[in-house]
Structures are given as C-alpha cells and as structure tokens.
C-alpha cells in the first residue's frame, strides 16, 4: 500500500497575530507582538502531524495558482505530505485565516477561497486503492463534498479502507445533516463543544455514547482535561500532560494525528488516547499548528 492515510480536505494558510490586544473599529491601530504566516486548515495541519509521526500521507484538495496556494503546497511537501493529487486552479483564489491570539483565547476571520470546491467525484477509486484509510475534516466548510460524502465513505469501505471524520466547528451553528455519514464513519473525532452541539446532550460522556450508536468509535477532545473515547461496548478516558502553552492553533488536529496513528497500528484504545493527548499538548508549545508537532519518539516518552 502506497499511503497509510488519504486526506480529503482544505488548503488555507493561517496568518497568526499574537499579542494582548483586541481589534477596534474606527481606524484604531493596535500593535501586536508577533506575526507569522503558517500552514493552516484543519486537514493540512492534521496531514503534517500524521506525517511527522511517520505515517505515509497523501492529500487531495483544491487551491489557487497563487502565493498562498504555492506556500501551502511547498510547506506541506517539506513535511513529507504527498500533494501530487491536489487540484490547482488558475481561475480561483486560495483563502486565508487571520487568527488573533491573545494566549488565553483566539478569534478567527476566514476567507474560505476554494475550500468548498472539492467534490467526491474528484477522488478516484484508483487513489483510494493506494490508501489504507480516508480522513475528512472541516465538513461544514467543504460544502460541495458534503452531499456525496456518505457514498464516498461507502466506496472507501468497499475498497478496504477505514474512514474518519472531524467535522470541526459549524459556522452556521445548525449542527445537522450528517446522521447518514456518521453511520458510515469508523472513527469520529469531535471536540467537546462539537459533541455537545451535535447531540444536545448535557454532558460529554452522554454525548459520546449517543454518537457511538452511529459511528463505530468516538474520541472527544477535552483540551487540557484530556479526552474520552466511546464505542458501543466501552468508555475510556485519558489525561493530558502539563506543558507551557504558546499557541493552541491546531492542537485538535495533532490529537487526531496521534489517535489515528494508534488506530491504524491496532493499539489498545487507552494507549491510542494517551498518544493523541500527548500529540495535542506538545503541539501547543510553539506558534502555529505544525511547528510543535512531535515525532513519534518524542511523543512516546509520555506514553506507557
């Protein structure tokens, strides 16, 4: 098999502005401490994290033939992500997320660009056959992929792949429309807010149990409080590790990378959860979503 994971996702860079300030309208200029252009997008950050752990990773998405698109493809390639299947369009513009990070929280403004343009029909059976697993993130942003995504997961299963989904946040805050998709999902990876919003449950464990009646395995990210995983037969929990947090951008995507590393290597669930929590925590020690992502050897120092 050529690839461990194929990611169908979005390709936008992040412009991260850090400082203890809030923007103010009225042509008021505020000074930030640092500014950096980094790999952005949940799918791309996940891809880099998985490759950093040693998985063979391929990516398919849509970007423009422009500065931001070329930046993303170059930076992902440097991190051993195969981008040969990315669709580059001359008649569209790669988007951008501007993130204002004041250390305790962050605000995000996104120009979606070509995020919504990937379709299920762009993902051939031949490409699927080269992979063991198919991962999709940013479900609510990939609007042209949404309608046929259940069929794409079905195609993947017929060809022997397992599937995973991280919806990420729903900008419309409607949180519906993917029950059929969850039923065809092997691993569902929401965070606490997403799990509670989707299920309308009053607590995380109840939310995870409800989701596990559809997806085969659910792992809920709880930030500094660790994580909780639920299948139809069991519930497992893991703590995180204490680190000096610089930037939480992409921590959930690094968690996903660690979780799917363990899942694809048939680890026990408790060990898989622990690696995921460690990967998420370690990634927050540097600015941007990918700079702090660990190699497997470093992450395993915290995994028994």
Place the predicted regions along the sequence by residue.
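Glycine-rich phosphate/adenosyl-contacting loop at the front of the ribokinase-like
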Residues: 1-63, 67-74, 78, 246
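Conserved phosphate-binding/catalytic region of the ribokinase-like
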Residues: 1-5, 31, 155, 204-304
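Ribokinase/PfkB-type carbohydrate-kinase core domain
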Residues: 1-13, 75-88, 102-237
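Residues at secondary-structure transition points
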Residues: 33-41, 45, 67, 89, ...
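A general structural signal for well-ordered alpha-helical segments in protein cores
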Residues: 43-47, 69, 149, 192, ...
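Short, basic and Ser/Thr-rich N-terminal targeting/leader segments
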Residues: 53, 92-94, 223
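Short glycine/serine/threonine/alanine-rich loop segments
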Residues: 55, 81, 161, 267, ...
